[in-house]
Amino acid sequence: MAQKKAVTVKGKKATNGEEKPLAKRVTKSTKVQEEETVVPQSPSKKSRKQPVKEVPQFSEEDESDVEEQNDEQPGDDSDFETEEAAGLIDDEAEEDEEYNSDDEEDDDDDELEPGEVSKSEGADEVDESDDDEEAPVEKPVSKKSEKANSEKSEENRGIPKVKVGKIPLGTPKNQIVFVTNLPNEYLHKDLVALFAKFGRLSALQRFTNLNGNKSVLIAFDTSTGAEAVLQAKPKALTLGDNVLSVSQPRNKEENNERTVVVGLIGPNITKDDLKTFFEKVAPVEAVTISSNRLMPRAFVRLASVDDIPKALKLHSTELFSRFITVRRISQESISRTSELTLVVENVGKHESYSSDALEKIFKKFGDVEEIDVVCSKAVLAFVTFKQSDAATKALAQLDGKTVNKFEWKLHRFERSTSGRAILVTNLTSDATEADLRKVFNDSGEIESIIMLGQKAVVKFKDDEGFCKSFLANESIVNNAPIFIEPNSLLKHRLLKKRLAIGQTRAPRKFQKDTKPNFGKKPFNKRPAQENGGKSFVKRARF
């Protein structure tokens, strides 16, 4: 028993600190346990939970129990055995020191410095990140989106985007087509889709005239597309309920050489009437009518330049009981001067008059260079002679006389200047030129008076008479006051233009563009309250 106690005492001393290897072995096991438990506590970025390794813990009591079990084995009670046991303990302690020193070096290498991540943890993170990257979660979604985008792009390829604006300069004319007879309302994409099947479009230019008719210039990338459109059947050029009219644009100068201007046609004539009338002498390519409904003019384009002389023979012929005028559009206007040109006043208010009849009368006095029949409210025609003596004779013999039941009033042509002319308004129907001369003779010398129904234009020879004439404003002529204002030719021109445009549109009260709240109940806006004023009180309606 004494020997067993001695062995146990030596074992306890070794564990308590006298024998350092045993104590160091215990501390090493606890240190490894701390490191192995601390490292898993720093979770990775991918997975925050990791299994904690369980390491068996050895205490001093367990080691003592193990040694006691070893001591209980049979042996001799001699001193040799005790020395041998002590030697064995020393050898084991030395081996433990070597083993622990190696472990300490390995542990020193495995110890983490501040801010350092363990290699095993980084490897786990890399493996986890690789697993996450290889996970087929987003790849099918990206493939579907790319497939959907490709399908959308294929659908959009059916109706290409076309630049809307002026056709670029330098575009060959064999790549451009002119489209007319468009419906009043249509979609841009429908028009593009209709012509895109013939070829790739490069530009599209829209036009709208004063009558509201729409037309389009379409430019193709190649001439084959334009040729395909020109050769297409009407069924392939149908937009809505309209069959589009397609032609190739021509040179403006070339068109003018094949075009004649027709005047005095009247406001009720149509394009078909003119086309039928001129096709009696030559093929007609196109007919257009000006928007001025008071004094409209027509432009007839023939198929060939050689047919122009045939069309000019229709000048001064009768169309629907009206004598029309026909001349070249490129005809240079003859310069009118006061020495050679006489103005024939439209006393009879004729809407048309035969130029041949006028020529028969005026050629008695000399060679006539031009007779321009106008048939406006004030002027019937301008007669230009080749010599000034012929104009003087005609003015002296015809002015104020009646020939062939026609009252002639002539005066020399003067450039229209409103510098010394006044406009007299509010005249009665029985007012005459003599009545106005009685009023304005006191102002100054009168050059001319032109009666225009309830209006009159009085022109003075000097500025003094023009200035004094305004003193006669509100004078009484035939029991009615007259009103005087400067005669502005620009004003008359603008008023006529507005009147012509207004007649082609609906009455103002039916125009939606002039009334933004058309058809809506009016909104009575509450007046703003002033600072310090009384609050608004809405009154009851009775």
From Swiss-Prot:
<keyword id="KW-0677">Repeat</keyword>
<feature type="domain" description="RRM 4">
    <location>
        <begin position="420"/>
        <end position="489"/>
    </location>
</feature>
<feature type="region of interest" description="Disordered">
    <location>
        <begin position="505"/>
        <end position="542"/>
    </location>
</feature>
<dbReference type="InterPro" id="IPR035979">
    <property type="entry name" value="RBD_domain_sf"/>
</dbReference>
<dbReference type="GO" id="GO:0003677">
    <property type="term" value="F:DNA binding"/>
</dbReference>
<feature type="compositionally biased region" description="Acidic residues">
    <location>
        <begin position="123"/>
        <end position="135"/>
    </location>
</feature>
<dbReference type="GO" id="GO:0005634">
    <property type="term" value="C:nucleus"/>
</dbReference>
<feature type="domain" description="RRM 2">
    <location>
        <begin position="258"/>
        <end position="331"/>
    </location>
</feature>
<keyword id="KW-0597">Phosphoprotein</keyword>
<comment type="function">
    <text>Its capacity to bind DNA and protein(s), and its differential expression during development suggest a role in the regulation of gene expression during Drosophila development. It could, in interaction with other factors, be required for the translation of instructions provided by pattern forming genes and controls, via chromatin changes, the activity of genes critical for the process of morphogenesis of several embryonic territories.</text>
</comment>
<dbReference type="GO" id="GO:0005737">
    <property type="term" value="C:cytoplasm"/>
</dbReference>
<feature type="modified residue" description="Phosphoserine">
    <location>
        <position position="129"/>
    </location>
</feature>
<dbReference type="GO" id="GO:0003723">
    <property type="term" value="F:RNA binding"/>
</dbReference>
<keyword id="KW-0694">RNA-binding</keyword>
<feature type="compositionally biased region" description="Acidic residues">
    <location>
        <begin position="59"/>
        <end position="114"/>
    </location>
</feature>
<feature type="domain" description="RRM 1">
    <location>
        <begin position="175"/>
        <end position="251"/>
    </location>
</feature>
<feature type="modified residue" description="Phosphoserine; by PKA">
    <location>
        <position position="330"/>
    </location>
</feature>
<dbReference type="Pfam" id="PF00076">
    <property type="entry name" value="RRM_1"/>
</dbReference>
<feature type="compositionally biased region" description="Basic and acidic residues">
    <location>
        <begin position="136"/>
        <end position="158"/>
    </location>
</feature>
<feature type="modified residue" description="Phosphoserine">
    <location>
        <position position="443"/>
    </location>
</feature>
<keyword id="KW-0539">Nucleus</keyword>
<keyword id="KW-0238">DNA-binding</keyword>
<feature type="modified residue" description="Phosphoserine">
    <location>
        <position position="44"/>
    </location>
</feature>
<feature type="modified residue" description="Phosphoserine">
    <location>
        <position position="42"/>
    </location>
</feature>
<feature type="modified residue" description="Phosphoserine">
    <location>
        <position position="142"/>
    </location>
</feature>
<feature type="modified residue" description="Phosphoserine">
    <location>
        <position position="304"/>
    </location>
</feature>
<feature type="domain" description="RRM 3">
    <location>
        <begin position="340"/>
        <end position="429"/>
    </location>
</feature>
<feature type="modified residue" description="Phosphoserine">
    <location>
        <position position="120"/>
    </location>
</feature>
<protein>
    <recommendedName>
        <fullName>DNA-binding protein modulo</fullName>
    </recommendedName>
</protein>
<dbReference type="GO" id="GO:0000381">
    <property type="term" value="P:regulation of alternative mRNA splicing, via spliceosome"/>
</dbReference>
<dbReference type="GO" id="GO:0005730">
    <property type="term" value="C:nucleolus"/>
</dbReference>
<dbReference type="InterPro" id="IPR000504">
    <property type="entry name" value="RRM_dom"/>
</dbReference>
<feature type="region of interest" description="Disordered">
    <location>
        <begin position="1"/>
        <end position="166"/>
    </location>
</feature>
<dbReference type="GO" id="GO:0032991">
    <property type="term" value="C:protein-containing complex"/>
</dbReference>
<dbReference type="GO" id="GO:0043565">
    <property type="term" value="F:sequence-specific DNA binding"/>
</dbReference>
<dbReference type="GO" id="GO:0016607">
    <property type="term" value="C:nuclear speck"/>
</dbReference>
<dbReference type="InterPro" id="IPR012677">
    <property type="entry name" value="Nucleotide-bd_a/b_plait_sf"/>
</dbReference>
